[in-house]
């Protein structure tokens, strides 16, 4: 196995190193300046990013924006992961968006998501971690988590924007997301940066990296024992 990358993730977009598709015990260091950046919870309370994974390993999913139909359907499947299997593996699941914190509660009601969720409204953490802006044209394959096509999904997003209490895009529509496995402490074990809206990491492949049994998302969520 190749030696893990150990350069600090310090905040230079496009230069943040990515480890291979395996999880190392120690990981690579996350710069303290990034860990100290704030996120906001649903009540607007500021929490340092590093506090979210200080004590245990966390799967952190950065979404594009809360109006994105792809993000909505992906988070709907994240919501199906039983809390009991995460507790058993001592893993925290966290979603981070980049809207105002006022949009957190409606988004959770819409998706049924009840795990941890925060926002980075200035996108500082997105930038420091090298998350892309704009969509790279590439074939990302068929996602197991997305049910809507481009037309129907876009119309749903537009309808939610128009009928919502605040007419906005609930974040920068050009921003892409990504998935990281972090902690305990300022250690990064896995990084995936989305190239476009459909390039998110399949959930079960991430769960496997943190020792969580795969989940059947096709019907009522159940753990697949292997």
Curated annotation (Swiss-Prot):
Lineage: Eukaryota, Metazoa, Chordata, Craniata, Vertebrata
Region Disordered: start-end pairs: 1-24
Family: Belongs to the peroxiredoxin-like PRXL2 family. PRXL2C subfamily.
InterPro entries xrefs: PXL2A/B/C, Thioredoxin-like_sf
Domain of life: Eukaryota
PANTHER family associated with the record: PEROXIREDOXIN-LIKE 2C, PTHR28630
Gene3D superfamilies linked: Glutaredoxin
GO biological process per UniProt: positive regulation of ERK1 and ERK2 cascade; positive regulation of glycolytic process
UniProt name for this protein: Peroxiredoxin-like 2C
Gene (UniProt): Prxl2c
Protein's job: May positively regulate ERK1/2 signaling and AKT1 activation leading to HIF1A up-regulation with an increased expression of glycolysis genes and enhanced glycolysis.
């Amino acid at each position: 196995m190749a030696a893990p990358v150990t350069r600090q993730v310090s905040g230079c977009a496009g230069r943040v190193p990515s480890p291979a598709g395996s999880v190392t015990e120690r990981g690579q260091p996350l710069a303290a300046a990034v860990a100290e950046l704030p996120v906001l919870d649903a009540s607007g309370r500021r929490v340092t990013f590093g506090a979210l994974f200080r004590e245990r390993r966390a799967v952190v999913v950065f979404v594009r924006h809360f109006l994105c139909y792809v993000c909505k359907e992906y988070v709907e499947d994240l919501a199906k992961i039983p809390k009991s299997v995460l507790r058993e593996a001592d893993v925290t699941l966290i979603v981070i968006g980049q809207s105002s914190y006022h949009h957190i509660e409606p988004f959770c009601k819409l998706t049924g998501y009840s795990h941890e969720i925060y926002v980075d409204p200035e996108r500082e953490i997105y930038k420091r971690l090298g998350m892309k802006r704009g969509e790279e044209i590439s074939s990302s394959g068929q996602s197991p988590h997305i049910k809507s096509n481009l037309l129907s999904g876009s119309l749903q997003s537009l309808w939610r924007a128009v009928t919502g209490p605040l007419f906005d895009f609930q974040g920068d529509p050009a921003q892409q997301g990504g998935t990281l496995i972090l902690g305990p402490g300022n250690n990064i074990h896995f990084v995936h940066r989305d190239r476009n809206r459909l390039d998110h990491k399949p959930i079960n492949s991430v769960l496997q990296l943190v020792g969580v049994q795969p989940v059947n998302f096709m019907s009522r969520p159940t753990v697949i024992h292997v």
